[in-house]
């Protein structure tokens, strides 16, 4: 299932490399465009060929609103729900207005994608994508309305066994979350490598030895590029994707190391304490992929292990609210917290063939783009007109954007192609890709997402 997305990932990665050749100063935006275009392709069979397009503006508008409501301490009512009915608190807090405004604006975006997909399914122009399968499914028989489907963006499992109540997960699920998580990890990786330039040199040496200079890296090279995998693991340890992760809910009274946890308590995984534990990680604030040497399991294999010490990081979460993809018996249908009562948010199903393996897909995108970036380019600190190095803020205190995700503030870097020969290969790859389009599940569509008849 995961490998079926390879043509789309490869296609978008080729444009990313081409964009870096032509306009390297905008690498921050290029990484964001890649991630958004890929998930748009998978979910709705549409591309985001440039950063300045309506689809990206709509999605990042949703992300901005999500960041506001998800920012730690934004609304105390999240910690003390009883305040929702307190008239004095409601006089001075705009939490309800913000929530209703967010739901209204997000719904307009998501229903826009949903209705566009319905029209393309009707006229036969919709390529193979999850949105198409969802539109053609019997979602109404499953108790789902169109608004819930628009927030969900996953295929329905064939035989639902058990439904559970609405979860307070990411609104828009895969599309909204997938747009930012991959790009912020790539940009955090660049920040980390700038803080420790020896990492770039080691990666260049490994890629030159394994891949050479006459071709670009492919997914098949991954087992032979352990240092690249170490860089990805260290990035996710050094800068977790989400600042606080998903809330967990205690379904019964429990005790942990002498602490009583009442039923109904909100419990969160403190991955900052785990990732920066000096007993486990020497000099944890340093970006150092060498510490991941010998950790050969994939992120999903680590997460599925019964031993938490097997995990190199907890950026994908843990427990029943872990990132989709680890446990195939769980199928997440994320609905908005204000979706109509009774709409499904989590379905357990028997056939795992339709499971959207988000964690695996993210890992493959990170590997492909990082390997192509380091194969083709040098990465250095940028300099101003006087020749002075432009500093990059490596700190957590001031180097991260406000909001729920660990997004680095925009920063300067000097990205240059490693040789004219490599530039020629990267340029030719994108020229060919534009002519041939994307071949995905026996359906070929062009560079803007239209089906090629």
Predicted feature locations:
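Conserved cytochrome P450 K-helix/beta-meander segment immediately N-terminal to the heme-binding cysteine loop
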Residues: 269-304, 339, 430-431
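Short, cationic low-complexity segments
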Residues: 294, 429-453
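Cytochrome P450 heme-thiolate "Cys pocket" and heme-binding signature region
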Residues: 153-155, 159, 171-172, 257, ...
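Cytochrome P450 I-helix active-site segment
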Residues: 10, 57-65, 125-134, 191-242, ...
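Cytochrome P450 catalytic-core helices
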Residues: 181-199, 204-206, 327-333, 360-376
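Hydrophobic, well-ordered secondary-structure elements that form the walls
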Residues: 203, 235, 261-264, 287, ...
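Conserved beta-strand elements of beta-rich interaction domains across eukaryotes
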Residues: 266, 273-274, 320-321, 336-338, ...
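Cytochrome P450 heme-thiolate monooxygenase catalytic core
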Residues: 2-186
